[in-house]
Curated annotation (Swiss-Prot):
First-listed, main subcellular location of the protein, grouped into a coarse class: Golgi
One of the record's GO molecular function terms: N-acetyltransferase activity
Biological role stated in the UniProt entry: Plays a role in regulation of gastrulation, possibly by controlled reduction of cell adhesion in the periblastopore region which is necessary for optimal cell motility.
Residue spans crossing the bilayer: 44-64, 66-86
Domain N-acetyltransferase: residue ranges: 62-211
Sequence similarity: Belongs to the camello family.
Subcellular location: Golgi apparatus membrane
Gene name in the database record: cml
EC number: 2.3.1.-
Protein name, entry field: Probable N-acetyltransferase camello
Keyword Transmembrane: yes
GO biological process: gastrulation with mouth forming second; negative regulation of cell adhesion
PANTHER family attached to this UniProt entry: GNAT FAMILY N-ACETYLTRANSFERASE, N-ACETYLTRANSFERASE CAMELLO-RELATED
Enzyme class, UniProt record, top EC level: transferase
Length: 219
């Protein structure tokens, strides 16, 4: 079995850490598309679109063309959402990882390494909502290494850090389409605290939800 080591971020990890996070975010696009295709709202909208065009034109070809256009617009909307999300974070805390995570005693960034190769990342920062909570974020594991329990090790690293720094809980958020991530967090011991539908048009159309999880640290 591969020897996985978790260590603190170094400046030389910069490009790899950003790449892993961005790719991990964008790869949720297929799952998002499949999820959207199963929602009642999708069937309702496509039915209304097809029926309206057919009733207005009497043409099956135009009605089907309208469905293709609707699907293309939906795909582009999801594509823009996930690629835009990755870009926004790359321009925020991931733009200067050293400054965002390594210059405060209550924040940190780690990488998972196998044979000198960085294959995973995770960051932790104090919550802006509560002084006793630490946020787990920017967790990502390279696709070819996801059967090695690296995600579990990264989560546990953040939990241990929070305990050492005197925090009472570790919190995080994840989308409902991220099934593997949700299973990981629940397996580690995180408990779901609430679920929200974000106000953006894409989230309203697709019924995507964001779940908030909390891990209470025992004293």
């Amino acid at each position: 079995m591969a020897n996985v080591s978790i260590r603190k971020y170094k400046t030389s990890d910069y490009e790899t850490a950003r790449f892993l996070f961005a790719e991990g975010t964008k790869e949720h696009l297929p799952a998002a598309c499949m999820y959207t295709l199963t929602t009642p709202r999708f069937y309702f909208i496509t039915f209304v679109a097809f029926t309206s065009v057919f009733m207005g034109t009497g043409s099956y070809v135009l009605a089907l063309t309208s469905l293709v256009a609707l699907l293309a617009a939906g795909w582009y909307g999801l594509y823009s959402e996930f690629h835009g999300l990755a870009s926004r974070f790359l321009r925020k805390d991931m733009l200067d990882i050293e400054k965002s995570y390594m210059m405060s005693e209550n924040a940190c960034f780690w990488v998972a390494e196998i044979d000198g190769k960085v294959v995973g990342t995770v960051g932790a920062q104090p919550s802006t909502d509560a002084d006793d909570e630490l946020l787990l974020q920017r967790i990502s594991v390279a696709r070819d290494y996801r059967q090695l329990r690296i995600g579990t090790k990264l989560c546990q690293t953040v939990i241990d850090f929070a305990r050492q720094r005197g925090f009472n809980a570790v919190c995080l958020e994840t989308a409902n389409i991220q099934r593997a991530a949700t299973n990981l967090y629940e397996r580690v011991g995180f408990k779901k605290s609430r679920v929200e539908i974000l106000p953006s048009l894409v989230h309203q159309y697709t019924s995507f939800t964001v779940a908030y999880y909390r891990y209470n640290i025992k004293s």
